[in-house]
Every structure is written in C-alpha cells, then in structure tokens.
C-alpha cells in the first residue's frame, strides 16, 4: 500500500507492486514512469512499456523499481543478444533498438542545451554508425583472480567485481582471442594478478588498441612491478594467436588507486608508435 506525503501525494513503499507506463528514458538507460505523482526509474525498460513494477528503493522525490512483469512491450524494445548485459557495466541501451537509442540520445542533448545552456537549438538528425557491432578499437580489461581462475572482462555495474565477458559483441573478434590467450598464459605460468584490497600481485590490466586503417593491434599489459615473467614466450604465443599484433608494451603502475595506466612504458617487442 502507499502512504501520503506532507504535500498530499501518495508515497510509494518498498516491495509495493504498481502498474506503470514508461514515458521517457534517463541518460543511463533507465526508463522513467510516474505513479501517483512520484517518478520511478526502472532499469531495462523501454518507452511505451506497460509494466508491473516492484518498488525496491524509495527516496523523497523519486523511487527505483525493477520489472516484475512486462504487460505490454514498447515499440523500441528488442531482445538483447549479450548473455551478461544485465550484469556487466559496459552497456546501457542493448534492450532497445539502435534507432530508438539514437532518438533518445538526440533528446538528451537537446534537453541539456535547453535546460542547462538556456539555448533554443536547431537540432539536426544524428548520423547513424554504419557498424553497430565490432566497432570498438580500444578495450581495457581488469584482470583478477576469481574462484581460483584468472579472469579478464569488465566491471559489474557500480562495483569492482569483474564479469568475464571477453566475447563482447562491440569489439572485434580478435580481441577475444588475445584476452583468452593472455588469461590462459597467466594461469598456466602461475603469474600473479593484482588484488585491489592488498595492493599485491603483478598483472593489473590488459589494454588493447587497434588501428583500423593499418589493421595493426597494440597489446599492453599493465603491471605492478618492473617486468613480466616469461615475456619472450608470451610474445611468441601471442603472435601466433593474432597476426595483427604489431607491438607489445609493458606499462608500470605501482599506485594503489583506480587509475589504470602508470606514467612509465617499455616496449617489449615491435614498434614504439
């Protein structure tokens, strides 16, 4: 049941089930609905959705809910193809079509220019990308030991827990080959990986950068030390796995912080640029 605020509005309560229609989206991909005058943010919802929503958090001016059941889907809703989308923190709009995503992003820009800039912009249509899959040319993978296994992927939403998702659809397929080879090599050669709590362990991140015009890939290992054990064997195997590799770089970062790259780099093999 709901209760009234001092202003006479109905206040939602935690675990309450309410019917809601999504009428807008926030810039972080949450659908927005209003029930009894209260704004509700609902992850993984789409404009036009009619939902049964379970309230999970109630604040003074707005609430958060989760989808209990989809009563009617909005036109922009699609079935996301990523198996870890709802756990990984890398994407926000995979549950809606690309066309719908562009509409909302254009609206975010226009709203900010009007509300924050005090402008009346003449908006031009967004030019869509010719590639919606495999377009990323850079990736930074935290490397951690989880359940006795060396794991590389992306951080879960609002956490530093690594989600094993080397096979992300937004990156080229050969990124996955490099990630899988690297984690397997570290595991088989008992090379330690970084632990954020203790500040100990060697390998912190795997950083990949691809030049589409040159078809070349730079591989960078970020380490909490001076050198990589078995570096020559790592490089030899890496070149066999991915022929696009043009350089292998070691980045030194001994700082106990969230900053990924340190200030010192050393090229282990290949081009310096």
Functional labels for PLM-detected ranges:
Residues 2-273:
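Accessory RNA-recognition modules of RNA-modification enzymes
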């Amino acid at each position: 049941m709901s209760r009234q605020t001092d202003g006479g509005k109905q206040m939602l309560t935690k675990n309450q089930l309410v019917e809601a229609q999504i009428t807008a989206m926030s810039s972080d991909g949450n659908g927005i609905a209003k029930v009894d005058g209260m704004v509700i943010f609902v992850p993984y919802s789409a404009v036009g959705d009619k939902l049964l929503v379970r309230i999970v958090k109630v604040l003074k001016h707005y609430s958060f809910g989760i989808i209990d059941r989809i009563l009617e889907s909005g036109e922009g809703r699609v079935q996301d193809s990523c198996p870890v989308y709802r756990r990984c923190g890398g994407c926000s709009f995979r549950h809606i079509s690309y066309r719908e995503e562009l509409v909302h992003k254009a609206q975010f820009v226009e709203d900010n220019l009007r509300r924050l800039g005090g402008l009346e912009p003449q908006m031009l249509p967004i030019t869509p990308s010719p590639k919606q899959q495999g377009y990323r040319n850079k990736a930074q993978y935290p490397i951690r030991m989880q359940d006795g296994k060396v794991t590389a992927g992306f951080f879960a939403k609002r956490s530093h827990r690594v989600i094993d998702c080397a096979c992300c659809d937004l990156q080229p397929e050969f990124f996955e080959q490099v990630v899988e080879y690297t984690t397997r090599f570290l595991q088989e050669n008992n090379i330690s990986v970084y632990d954020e709590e203790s500040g100990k362990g060697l390998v912190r991140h795997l950083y990949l950068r691809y030049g589409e015009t040159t078809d070349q890939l730079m591989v960078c290992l970020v380490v909490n030390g001076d050198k990589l054990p078995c570096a020559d064997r790592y490089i030899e195997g890496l070149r066999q796995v991915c022929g696009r590799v043009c350089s292998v770089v070691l980045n030194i970062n001994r700082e106990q912080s969230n900053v990924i790259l340190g200030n010192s780099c050393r090229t282990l093999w290949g081009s310096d640029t």
